A protein has these predicted regions:
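Conserved PLP-enzyme active-site core in the AAT-like
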Residues: 147-387, 408
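N-terminal mitochondrial targeting presequence
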Residues: 1-49
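PLP-dependent enzyme catalytic core of the Aspartate aminotransferase-like
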Residues: 3, 8, 48-50, 57-63, ...
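Flexible, glycine/charged-enriched surface loops at secondary-structure junctions
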Residues: 99-104, 130, 162-163, 343-347, ...
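Short acidic (Asp/Glu) and glycine-rich catalytic loops that position anionic groups and cofactors
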Residues: 72-79, 123-131, 247, 330-335, ...
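Conserved internal helical-beta-strand scaffold that buttresses enzyme catalytic cores
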Residues: 74, 87, 122, 126, ...
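Conserved PLP-binding catalytic core of the aspartate aminotransferase-like
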Residues: 389-457, 527-534
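N-terminal "arm"/small-domain region of PLP-dependent enzymes with the aminotransferase-like
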Residues: 44-132, 461
Length: 555
């Protein structure tokens, strides 16, 4: 530790404070006597004064951004997050008895991932890999990245002699393109699940008039489909088409497919045609780690994932690769990530990934994953009881894909209605849609609500809210007199209309319900305080935290 910094420590007043984001901030003051004692030069003191902004809290430095974050925190706390690709950040409860009494409490009491992601590690540049960096001063970063890689392999029970992993990708999309770059050449052929059938943009999506993503711009793409009627992947047709198309790469993975994958069958198709098999398990990686979904690792050559969905880490990506597949596979993957597709890694994010992976290996995480699936199945059951059409007639994972076309509604209209009443869903294409811009369904994901300690009984309430939202949408569409989206919005925005009155009541009911449940990462909630009281954790909450969840004007 530098002598100057060491001399300052006794004179720095450190006051941990919890802001709306529960981030620790420091209030720094320098004793003038230190300067008189010669421990601080006049230039050093002047520099500290000039850099005062570096020690301000967010609220002090930028009230405008702080207000936006405050409003967003209220939105999440007072609403129901049903976006399938969103999941609250993970938390681990220290007392073992809490895990025993309530297995989902690991989501509520620690800010470990957020703290790692907002740490000093963001300051360090570290292009390259551990032991082979292009910058100095990376001894601690090397330890961190090696730890993260070890935890990634352990989380999925992988043998380090067989599997390797790159933890540097900035996102799942970057991970996918880097994996493509490592495995195949430009204009080689790929096959992935079509976007309207539940696939992902990065798996080669294009339209009749335009190649939409880099994966279709730089590679030749021929999507496979689900079977009309059942919504299940048509493995028979995939077998036939792959035999004709001879892809160099087959991608198995989805963003809106509510069933599990037959990796063994896909392996056979890939081997028959000399194809690599890549699994993009971004949506289900947490469920795979918990043993609640089939594992792609037994059959696939490369496995990619995001880290922020059911794995519940920060926003980033991972690439797993079989080292025994080809002798240069590890080198190809690592070089595809850097320098081919990105620059220096985000070390703060890697730290957050490491924390999340440790938590994913905890037995409590398995209970969380089981509950996610149970909650999704409860939503599906209740919606089906109202005779709504669900893709594949149910779910085996964390999401439900709801087909609204039989009702004469679009996903866009339900998304608009739900936004107004603090329910967040996303419009989504369903099998048979002719345009991704006007999708006929919505995707409902249950990872985030499970992280808020909701179980099957609460899912019945949530499903009832969704049912009411659809009925209000039908009323608004009738009031609009046509099916134009702008007139639909105008109808439920008119306070004299029945749809507006029903919507206002639904909004109140949703807020009243949602604010009974803690929001992971934000301990300053009445629900969070009540949980602490219930379990008699001896913490002086009144002095440790100041409740700062505020209801913004207009809500």
């Amino acid at each position: 530790m530098p002598a100057l910094l060491r001399s300052l420590i006794p004179s720095i007043s450190v006051a941990p404070r919890r802001t709306l984001l529960s981030a620790r901030t420091l209030q720094v003051s320098i004793e003038p006597s230190k300067c008189r004692q010669g421990l601080l030069s006049a230039n050093a003191l002047s520099s500290l004064v000039q850099n005062k902004a570096l020690y301000q809290t967010l609220a002090e430095a930028d009230p405008e951004v702080a207000k936006i974050i405050e409003d967003e925190t209220w939105r999440q706390f007072s609403g129901l997050e049903l976006i399938a690709s969103e999941a609250s950040l993970p938390v681990v409860v220290s007392p073992d008895h809490l895990l025993t009494m309530h297995p989902t409490l690991q989501n509520l009491t620690s800010l470990a991932v957020m703290e790692a992601n907002g740490s000093m590690l963001t300051n360090k540049y570290s292009e390259g890999l551990p032991g082979a960096r292009y910058y100095g001063g990376n001894e601690h970063i090397d330890i961190l990245e090696n730890l993260c890689r070890d935890r990634a392999l352990k989380a999925f029970n992988l043998d380090p002699k067989v599997w390797g992993v790159n933890v540097q990708p900035y996102s799942g999309s970057t991970a996918n393109f880097a994996a493509f770059t490592a495995l195949i050449n430009p204009q080689d052929r790929i096959m992935g699940l079509g976007l309207p059938d539940g696939g992902h943009l990065t798996h080669g999506y294009y339209t009749a008039k335009k190649k939409i993503t880099a994966s279709s711009i730089y590679f030749q793409s021929f999507p496979y489909r689900v079977t009309p009627g059942t919504g299940l992947i048509d493995y028979e047709q995939l077998t036939t088409n792959a035999g004709l198309y001879k892809p160099r790469l087959i991608v198995c993975g989805a963003s809106a497919y509510p069933r599990d994958w037959d990796y063994q069958r896909l392996r056979k198709i890939a081997d028959t045609n000399g194809s690599y098999l890549l699994s993009d398990m971004a949506h289900i990686s947490g469920l795979v780690a918990a043993g609640e979904q089939n594992s792609p690792f037994e059959y696939c050559d490369v496995v990619t994932t995001t880290t922020h969905k059911t794995l519940r880490g920060p926003r980033a990506g991972l690439i797993f690769f079989r080292k025994d597949k080809e002798s240069d596979m590890e080198q190809r993957v690592n070089q595809a990530v850097f320098p081919a597709c990105q620059g220096g890694p985000h070390n703060n994010t890697i730290a957050g990934i490491a924390v999340a992976l440790k938590q994913a290996a905890d037995p409590a995480f398995k209970a969380y994953a089981k509950q996610v699936i149970a909650n999704a199945r409860t939503i599906a059951k209740v919606l089906s009881s109202h005779e709504y059409k669900l893709q594949t007639d149910g779910t085996d994972n964390h999401l439900v894909l709801w087909d609204l076309r039989p009702l004469g509604l679009t996903g866009s209209k339900i998304e608009k209605i739900c936004d107004e009443c603090h329910i967040t869903v996303n419009k989504n294409a369903v099998s048979g849609d002719t345009s991704a811009q006007v999708p006929g369904g919505v995707r409902v994901g249950l990872a985030a609500l499970t992280s808020r300690s909701m179980k099957e009984s609460e899912m019945e309430t949530v499903a009832a809210f969704l049912h009411r939202a659809v009925q209000i949408a039908l009323t608004a569409q009738k009031e609009a007199g046509d099916k134009l989206l702008k007139n639909f919005v105008a109808a439920f925005s008119n306070k004299d209309n029945e749809s507006a009155k029903l919507l206002e009541q639904l909004k109140k009911d949703v807020i009243e319900f949602s604010t009974q449940f803690p929001l992971p990462g934000v301990p300053d909630t009445v629900s969070w305080l009540s949980i602490y009281t219930t379990f008699e954790v001896l913490v002086d909450l009144s002095s440790s935290f100041q409740s700062s969840i505020k209801r913004p004007a207009g809500y």
